[in-house]
């Protein structure tokens, strides 16, 4: 494994002085700031295309996320990057990366545990009584997969009789980067703490190397979930066959009332 040693302090100071000397301070772009006009354009674009409302109070959050995109690109500042990505010159990859950078990916295992209790105690018995072959569930804002895998654990535990129906889960998100994490199903051990011990023993496999503080959802459970990109603001989105259970609370909370009604 490569190691990268920090530059000595004096060396860093010399490099910093040289870099500053190349461009007068008055003309150096403010990489980490966004103009009010561009913030308004960004907020409007994100709300129109993803449904997520971005109030003015989020400006520093937006700057922090966009500055990473600027550093990974050829642009000198956030404003220059915004001018490009919100222009006709932007390609599909540009817009995908832009949306990936700005979407919120807050998620946990067993987030809102009362919802999963209700699924287990009320919904599942009702669906089992209907004698259907497959119970279909949808995690509508899957993020890195924790909600979908929680669903899978609850369903696997509640449908463990040979006479019970099978289940299938569709897990979607607009962010393609977090979907890649979700497909791998690998998580830090700390993130798995909310999972009950019995479920961890049954559905989670720790890394062979104890120095790696992570674990992976077992393959039979991963196989029950199909991950895919989906934008809830697309009026023609398709999830295939009708769903029996839909988890969408954790995305609707970021939408305005009118957008919530439109999605539902």
Regions found by a protein language model. Give the residues of each.
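Conserved AdoMet
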Residues: 2-138
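Short, thiol/selenol-centered motifs that function as redox-active sites or metal-ligating centers
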Residues: 32, 142-148, 251, 255
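Alpha-helical elements of the RecA-like P-loop NTPase motor core of helicases
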Residues: 117, 149, 180
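Short, well-ordered alpha-helices that flank and scaffold nucleotide-derived cofactor binding pockets
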Residues: 121, 125, 153-157, 184
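Conserved class I S-adenosyl-L-methionine
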Residues: 132-150, 170
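Extended basic-aromatic, gly/pro-enriched interface segments that bind polyanionic ligands
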Residues: 140, 161-247, 251-259
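Conserved SAM-binding loop of SAM-dependent methyltransferases across substrates and taxa
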Residues: 144-162
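A short glycine-rich, Lys/Arg-flanked "PGG" loop and its adjoining helix->strand segment in the class I
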Residues: 261-264
């Amino acid at each position: 494994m490569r190691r990268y040693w920090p530059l000595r302090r004096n060396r860093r100071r010399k490099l910093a002085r040289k870099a500053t000397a190349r461009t007068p301070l008055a003309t150096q772009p403010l990489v980490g700031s966004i103009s009010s006009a561009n913030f308004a354009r960004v907020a409007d674009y994100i709300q129109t295309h993803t449904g997520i409302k971005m109030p003015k109070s989020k400006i520093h959050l937006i700057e922090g996320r966009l500055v990473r995109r600027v550093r990974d690109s050829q642009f000198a500042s956030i404003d220059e990057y915004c001018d490009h990505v919100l222009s006709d010159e932007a390609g599909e990859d540009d817009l995908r990366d832009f949306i990936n950078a700005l979407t919120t990916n807050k998620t946990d295992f067993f987030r809102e545990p009362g919802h999963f209790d209700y699924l287990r105690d009320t919904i599942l018995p009702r669906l089992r009584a209907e004698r259907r072959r497959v119970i279909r569930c949808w995690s509508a804002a899957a993020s890195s997969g924790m909600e979908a895998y929680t669903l899978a654990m609850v369903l696997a535990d509640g449908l463990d009789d040979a006479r019970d129906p099978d289940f299938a889960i569709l897990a979607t998100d607009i962010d393609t980067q977090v979907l890649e994490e979700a497909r791998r199903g690998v998580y830090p051990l700390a993130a798995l703490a909310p999972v009950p011990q019995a479920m961890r023993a049954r559905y989670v496999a720790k890394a062979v190397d104890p120095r790696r503080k992570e674990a992976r959802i077992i393959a039979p459970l991963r196989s029950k979930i199909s991950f895919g990109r989906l934008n809830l603001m697309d009026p023609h989105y398709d999830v295939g066959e009708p769903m029996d259970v839909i988890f969408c609370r954790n995305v609707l909370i970021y939408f305005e009332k009118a957008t919530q009604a439109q999605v539902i």
